[in-house]
Amino acid sequence: MRRAAALLSVPCLLPMLLAACTGLSAGPEVSSMAPVPASRDSAWVRAKRALTAETFTLDVQDSLGGRITAMRYPSATAKVGTAAACRVQLALAIQGTWDGAQLASSSRWIAPAEMAQSKPDVCEKDRQETLARIQEVVVPPAK
Protein backbone atom coordinates (compact mmCIF):
# COMPACT_ATOMS: atom_id res chain seq x y z
CA MET A 1 0.00 0.00 0.00
CA ARG A 2 2.79 2.42 0.86
CA ARG A 3 4.57 1.66 -2.38
CA ALA A 4 1.47 2.54 -4.40
CA ALA A 5 1.10 5.82 -2.51
CA ALA A 6 4.75 6.67 -3.16
CA LEU A 7 4.39 5.97 -6.87
CA LEU A 8 1.28 8.13 -7.09
CA SER A 9 3.02 11.11 -5.51
CA VAL A 10 5.93 11.09 -7.99
CA PRO A 11 3.86 12.24 -11.02
CA CYS A 12 2.42 15.05 -8.90
CA LEU A 13 5.84 16.28 -7.78
CA LEU A 14 7.53 16.01 -11.16
CA PRO A 15 5.77 19.01 -12.78
CA MET A 16 6.55 21.13 -9.72
CA LEU A 17 10.24 20.24 -9.90
CA LEU A 18 10.44 20.88 -13.63
CA ALA A 19 8.65 24.23 -13.31
CA ALA A 20 11.11 25.30 -10.64
CA CYS A 21 14.08 24.59 -12.90
CA THR A 22 12.94 26.12 -16.18
CA GLY A 23 13.40 29.65 -17.35
CA LEU A 24 16.94 30.12 -16.02
CA SER A 25 20.18 30.68 -17.93
CA ALA A 26 23.71 30.53 -16.59
CA GLY A 27 26.56 32.86 -17.39
CA PRO A 28 30.10 31.72 -18.12
CA GLU A 29 32.08 29.98 -15.40
CA VAL A 30 34.95 32.12 -14.10
CA SER A 31 37.88 30.66 -12.14
CA SER A 32 40.57 32.37 -10.09
CA MET A 33 43.36 31.57 -7.64
CA ALA A 34 44.69 33.77 -4.82
CA PRO A 35 47.32 33.31 -2.12
CA VAL A 36 46.08 33.69 1.46
CA PRO A 37 48.61 34.97 4.03
CA ALA A 38 47.13 32.78 6.76
CA SER A 39 46.84 29.12 7.67
CA ARG A 40 44.49 26.84 5.78
CA ASP A 41 42.21 26.64 8.84
CA SER A 42 42.04 30.44 9.15
CA ALA A 43 41.28 30.76 5.45
CA TRP A 44 38.47 28.21 5.86
CA VAL A 45 36.90 30.15 8.75
CA ARG A 46 37.22 33.44 6.86
CA ALA A 47 35.61 31.94 3.75
CA LYS A 48 32.64 30.59 5.71
CA ARG A 49 32.23 33.96 7.47
CA ALA A 50 32.30 35.81 4.13
CA LEU A 51 29.73 33.49 2.53
CA THR A 52 27.43 33.80 5.53
CA ALA A 53 27.69 37.59 5.42
CA GLU A 54 26.73 37.52 1.74
CA THR A 55 23.69 35.31 2.57
CA PHE A 56 24.87 32.28 0.59
CA THR A 57 23.24 28.92 1.17
CA LEU A 58 26.06 26.46 1.83
CA ASP A 59 25.53 23.21 -0.09
CA VAL A 60 28.79 21.38 0.65
CA GLN A 61 31.10 22.05 3.58
CA ASP A 62 34.14 19.77 3.61
CA SER A 63 36.65 21.24 6.05
CA LEU A 64 39.05 18.30 5.75
CA GLY A 65 39.11 18.51 1.97
CA GLY A 66 38.92 22.30 1.95
CA ARG A 67 35.81 22.49 -0.26
CA ILE A 68 32.79 24.76 -0.01
CA THR A 69 30.04 25.00 -2.60
CA ALA A 70 27.32 27.57 -2.16
CA MET A 71 24.54 29.44 -3.93
CA ARG A 72 23.13 32.87 -3.26
CA TYR A 73 19.46 32.87 -4.17
CA PRO A 74 17.43 35.97 -5.05
CA SER A 75 14.86 37.28 -2.62
CA ALA A 76 11.19 36.57 -3.24
CA THR A 77 10.56 40.24 -4.05
CA ALA A 78 13.46 40.69 -6.49
CA LYS A 79 12.45 42.31 -9.76
CA VAL A 80 13.69 40.84 -13.03
CA GLY A 81 16.25 43.18 -14.56
CA THR A 82 17.88 44.12 -11.26
CA ALA A 83 20.97 42.64 -9.62
CA ALA A 84 18.75 41.28 -6.85
CA ALA A 85 17.25 38.80 -9.35
CA CYS A 86 20.62 37.17 -10.05
CA ARG A 87 21.80 33.98 -8.39
CA VAL A 88 25.50 33.45 -7.78
CA GLN A 89 26.89 29.91 -7.75
CA LEU A 90 30.30 29.52 -6.10
CA ALA A 91 32.76 26.70 -5.44
CA LEU A 92 35.81 27.30 -3.25
CA ALA A 93 38.83 25.07 -2.73
CA ILE A 94 41.26 25.95 0.04
CA GLN A 95 44.66 24.26 0.07
CA GLY A 96 47.78 24.90 2.07
CA THR A 97 49.51 24.49 5.41
CA TRP A 98 49.87 26.32 8.71
CA ASP A 99 51.95 29.14 7.16
CA GLY A 100 49.94 29.91 4.03
CA ALA A 101 47.08 28.82 1.85
CA GLN A 102 45.72 29.10 -1.68
CA LEU A 103 42.10 29.97 -2.42
CA ALA A 104 40.76 28.67 -5.73
CA SER A 105 37.30 29.80 -6.76
CA SER A 106 34.93 28.97 -9.56
CA SER A 107 31.76 31.01 -9.97
CA ARG A 108 28.96 31.88 -12.33
CA TRP A 109 25.76 33.86 -12.29
CA ILE A 110 22.35 32.37 -13.02
CA ALA A 111 19.40 34.55 -14.02
CA PRO A 112 15.95 34.35 -15.58
CA ALA A 113 16.34 33.61 -19.31
CA GLU A 114 14.89 36.95 -20.41
CA MET A 115 17.33 38.83 -18.17
CA ALA A 116 20.27 36.68 -19.27
CA GLN A 117 19.52 37.69 -22.87
CA SER A 118 18.83 41.39 -22.35
CA LYS A 119 20.96 42.38 -19.31
CA PRO A 120 23.75 39.85 -18.68
CA ASP A 121 26.09 42.66 -17.62
CA VAL A 122 23.94 43.36 -14.53
CA CYS A 123 24.46 39.82 -13.22
CA GLU A 124 28.13 39.77 -14.19
CA LYS A 125 28.75 43.00 -12.30
CA ASP A 126 26.90 41.60 -9.27
CA ARG A 127 28.99 38.40 -9.42
CA GLN A 128 32.23 40.39 -9.61
CA GLU A 129 31.28 42.70 -6.73
CA THR A 130 30.15 39.78 -4.57
CA LEU A 131 33.39 37.88 -5.16
CA ALA A 132 35.44 41.01 -4.45
CA ARG A 133 33.74 41.37 -1.05
CA ILE A 134 34.34 37.69 -0.26
CA GLN A 135 37.97 37.99 -1.37
CA GLU A 136 38.44 41.03 0.89
CA VAL A 137 37.35 38.99 3.92
CA VAL A 138 39.43 35.91 3.09
CA VAL A 139 42.49 37.86 1.89
CA PRO A 140 42.38 41.21 3.72
CA PRO A 141 44.29 44.06 2.08
CA ALA A 142 47.76 44.72 3.50
CA LYS A 143 47.95 47.65 5.89
PLM features: residue spans?
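Bacterial N-terminal signal peptides that target proteins for export
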Residues: M1-L13
